[in-house]
Structure formats: structure tokens, C-alpha cells
From Swiss-Prot:
Induction note: Part of the 17-gene eut operon transcribed from a single promoter, induced by ethanolamine and adenosylcobalamin (AdoCbl, vitamin B12).
InterPro entries attached to this UniProt entry: ATPase_NBD, EutA, FtsA/MreB
Gene of this entry: eutA
UniProt note: phenotype after gene disruption: Can use ethanolamine (EA) as a nitrogen source when AdoCbl but not cyano-B12 or hydroxy-B12 is provided; cannot use EA as a carbon source. Required for aerobic growth on ethanolamine supplemented with cobalamin (vitamin B12). A non-polar deletion mutant does not grow on EA between pH 5.5 and pH 8.5.
Protein name: Ethanolamine ammonia-lyase reactivase EutA
Alphabetic keyword roster: Bacterial microcompartment, Chaperone, Virulence
Localisation: Bacterial microcompartment
Pathway entry: Amine and polyamine degradation; ethanolamine degradation
Function: Reactivates suicidally inhibited ethanolamine ammonia-lyase (EAL), cyanocobalamin-inactivated EAL and O(2)-inactivated EAL; requires Mg(2+), ATP and adenosylcobalamin. Reactivation probably occurs by the ATP-dependent exchange of cobalamin. Protects EAL from inhibition by CN-B12, does not have adenosylation activity.
Coiled-coil residues: none
């Protein structure tokens, strides 16, 4: 059996907390000798987990780069792992941390110092999907062929991911979390973030001083927060819930058969702390309010496989060498790294399907760099090629982008597609790479051409989640 073993690392930098997870991954090529390689994870063993520590931020809300790097390197040392011995990895930055002024450069610098890692600055849609995968909601939905809604409730946001038979059918993000009100050990509010103050104003009246609230009154705030979280599930949103939405709503009239709660508040929902202010916020109070919420008690709430550690545990990577006779490559400057792949869910309307796939990745079709994947079910016929050409030209016309048009296909028709597409888009840098199998959430690197341009190395990187 053709297998590969990797030592990988997953680093999750969130609004409130950061964690590091080392894992040993084993990938197997499931394809026959004559077929396109198709790698799958067969073992995902977590070998070491760091404590969950607070994300270091300064008074202006920026990441403290030096302190963050020192914290992460300390986890390598504690695990007894040298950075150079790690084969692959993923750094995910989420929540309010992703919005800080120095988030992207800080994480890219960290990645370059540690190795060639997948780097994802996750907005609300991608964060929801990552949490749903990490919690095990996606695999539960796939195994049971049912609809599972995971709600990842962290410090600043609640991220919703709806899976239908394993596929993402909706995401949403509500600006409600357990650390919107920071407290001291006695439950006195020391700081109210703006969304938290908005909730206080609705419950107690505009202009209420959060620092004057008693512990019992914080319970009222937590109950209103629980109401808001449930409103997003039911689709009946109050004006306050509407104002706190960071995204669109979940699909209407679709009832999840199972609900799972992950994140720090999800962990408190599972294991309620004796001290409600042990984390110096109202996360435990919010978990209690969710436990007692009458509408939520009517729903099928189950504990997920992971709660506070619902995140990536690393990234699997495998490299393919592709024959230049089957690809089209013109005016594209290589190498290109960490390109997210947009995989369409609807073969009938590729333009809209690509747009939806990019939305799930929190990517802007007109500014970000990405790869458009063709449907794996597409037949190798001339009529199918014409359909793809029409879709690609329509997509480029609707979403002009300064980056090259990059297309990846499982089928063996890259050269033909490129030759037919080039007259339609004569000025656009273009790459069509075929015989590559990709899945939702994958990233690819396209290396510098080898052997006089006859071979292009392509590395497919898949995020790894707890099994």
C-alpha cells in the first residue's frame, strides 16, 4: 500500500485563545497504478496538545508578534519537537484576531520562520466551516446522512455551520460570545466590548454602566445572549440579533436534525465550571443559560467529538509531478503558494457555484488569488469543454481580477481546454492543470517548471482535523 507518514502541526490563533497541536498523519494513495493519485488520511493521531493560552494582544488590539512567536516556540520545546523536523502544518487565524491591523503580516512571518505551512486568515464563513470540521459535525453528518448544525461559541462570536450529508449547506456568524464582558474573579465587569454593551443597553436601558452590574444581572445578560444564539437557529431574528449578524442568515426552512456546540462556551456547556467567573468573563454563565433555554432543550443537542479544540491538527501534503504535455501554462509567474481551491457544488450553474465556494472561503472574487476547480463529474467531451469555456469567460467578465486565471481539473484535458480558452481570454495570464484530485478546503502550490518546462510540480495540501 502506497502510504506517507507526516509529522504535522496545527496552530489556531483565535480572538481569546491560541493553541498548538502536533499530530502524526498517515496518507494512503487509494488510486490504482494507472489512475490519478488520490490521497486520503487513514490515521490522524494527536501526539501532543498545548494548554489553551490567551492570545497576546496590545492595547490597540494588534497581535504581539514577538510574544506570540515565543509562546508557540515554547510549545515546540515542551513537545520535544524541533521546528525543522515538522513536515507540514497549518496556521489558522480567526475571529477578531483576523481583523487586527498586523494579523496577516504577523502570521506570514511566523509561517516562514517555522516552515512552508498553509496559512488561512479565516473570516466568519471559513471559521464556521473549520470549527464544524474540527468538532466532528461534518463527519457525523456524512456518516448518518443527516443535517447537523455546529455552533462554535467563542470569546467574541458564535459561528454556525450547517452540514447536509457531509456537505456545507450554510454558514452564519453572530457577534455574541462569552468574552464580550470581561470580569474580575468576583464577577464585576471590568470591560464591555461594544456588542456586549449593546446587549446590556437592550436589557437594562441605554447608557447602563456595565461596571455597575451585579452578578445576578449578568445572568440576565447571558440569558439574552442565549436567546440571540437560538434566534439564528430558528430564523426568527429580533432587531438586536439582526444588528449583531456578521453574515447573511442560515438557509430558511431547513431544520437541523442534530445540533452540536463547540468552542470555549461549548466546553462549558459540556462541563460546567463550579466558579462562573473562573475565566474572568461570562462564558460559563452563557453556557448555563443555553442549558436552561426552553427552545434549545426541545432540540436534539449532542456533545461533539471536540469542543474547545475544534480546530485543525495539521495539514497533509503530497506532491505530484505533472507532464507538460497535458497542461496549459502561459504568462503565469511561478512559483505560486498557498492557493485556496474553490470547488463548485452545482454543476449546472458553475459561475454561481464558484462564487458560492469563494464566499465559503471568505474570498473576494475580484481581489484575492485562488484556483477554480472543475466538477469531477464533468465528462471528457467537446460539448462539456464548451460549457466550461462559457462558464469561465462569464466568470471572468463578471469578476475581473488582477491575478492569473488558475484552473484545476481531475480530467485529462488541460491542454485542450487551454487552447480553446486562450482565444476567448487573449490578455489574461492562464494556467490549466489537469489530473489533480482536490477536495473542499484544499490548498495547492504550483512550483517552478522543471526539465525545460516539461514538468510542473504541484503540491496539494489538505487541512487535517481530529478523527
Amino acid at each position: 500500500m502506497n502510504t506517507r507518514q507526516l509529522l504535522s502541526v496545527g496552530i489556531d490563533i483565535g480572538t481569546t485563545t491560541t493553541q498548538v497541536i502536533f499530530s502524526r498523519l498517515e496518507l494512503v494513495n487509494r488510486a490504482a497504478v494507472s489512475q490519478v493519485p488520490r490521497y486520503e488520511f487513514i490515521k490522524r493521531d494527536i501526539s501532543w496538545q498545548s494548554p489553551v493560552f490567551f492570545t497576546p494582544v496590545d492595547k490597540q488590539g494588534g497581535l504581539k508578534e514577538v510574544e506570540l512567536k515565543a509562546l508557540i516556540l515554547a510549545q515546540y520545546q515542551a513537545a520535544g519537537i524541533a521546528p525543522e523536523s515538522v513536515d507540514s502544518g497549518a496556521i489558522i487565524i480567526t475571529g477578531e484576531s483576523a481583523k487586527t491591523r498586523n494579523a496577516r503580516p504577523a502570521v506570514m512571518a511566523l509561517s516562514q520562520s517555522l516552515g512552508d505551512f498553509v496559512v488561512a486568515s479565516a473570516g466568519p464563513h471559513l471559521e464556521s466551516v473549520i470549527a464544524g470540521h474540527g468538532a466532528g459535525a461534518q463527519s457525523l453528518s456524512e456518516q448518518r446522512m443527516c443535517r447537523v448544525l455546529n455552533i462554535d461559541i467563542g470569546g467574541g462570536t458564535s459561528n454556525y455551520a450547517l452540514f447536509d450529508a457531509g456537505k456545507v449547506s450554510g454558514t452564519a456568524c453572530l457577534n455574541v460570545g462569552g468574552r464580550l464582558l470581561e470580569t474580575d474573579a468576583q464577577g464585576r465587569v471590568v470591560y464591555a466590548h461594544q456588542p456586549g454593551q449593546m446587549i446590556i443597553d437592550e436589557v437594562f436601558g441605554s447608557g447602563t454602566d456595565a461596571r455597575a452590574l451585579a452578578a445576578a444581572q449578568l445572568g440576565q445578560v447571558a440569558r439574552r445572549m442565549a436567546d440571540l444564539i437560538v434566534e439564528v437557529i430558528t430564523g426568527a431574528l429580533s432587531p438586536l440579533a439582526q444588528s449583531l449578524m456578521q453574515t447573511g442568515l442560515l438557509p430558511a426552512d431547513i431544520t437541523p436534525e442534530v445540533i452540536t456546540l463547540s468552542g470555549g462556551v461549548g466546553e462549558c456547556y459540556r462541563n460546567q465550571p463550579a466558579d462562573p467567573f473562573c475565566f474572568s468573563d461570562i462564558g460559563p454563565l452563557l453556557a448555563t443559560a443555553l442549558h436552561e433555554h426552553p427552545r434549545l432543550r426541545e432540540m436534539n443537542v449532542q456533545f461533539p467529538a471536540q469542543t474547545v479544540r475544534a480546530t485543525v491538527i495539521g495539514a497533509g501534503a503530497h506532491t505530484l509531478s505533472l507532464s507538460g504535455s497535458t497542461i496549459w501554462l502561459e504568462d503565469v509567474q511561478l512559483p505560486l503558494r498557498n492557493l485556496p481551491v474553490a470547488i463548485p457544488q452545482d454543476d449546472a450553474d458553475l459561475v454561481n457555484a464558484w462564487r458560492q465556494a469563494l464566499l465559503q472561503l471568505d474570498l473576494d472574487p475580484q481581489t484575492d488569488a485562488y484556483v477554480l476547480a472543475l466538477p469531477a463529474t464533468l465528462p471528457v467531451r467537446y460539448a462539456a469543454l464548451l460549457t466550461v469555456i462559457n462558464a469561465l469567460t462569464a466568470f471572468v467578465a463578471r469578476y475581473p481580477n488582477p491575478h492569473p486565471l488558475l484552473v484545476v481539473a481531475e480530467q485529462d484535458f488541460g491542454k485542450a481546454l487551454g487552447m480553446l480558452l486562450r482565444p476567448q481570454l487573449p490578455q489574461l495570464p492562464l494556467a490549466v492543470i489537469d489530473e489533480v484530485v482536490v477536495r473542499a478546503g484544499d490548498y495547492i502550490d504550483i512550483g517552478t517548471p522543471l526539465f525545460g518546462g516539461s514538468v510542473v510540480p504541484v503540491t496539494v495540501k489538505s487541512l487535517a482535523f481530529p478523527s
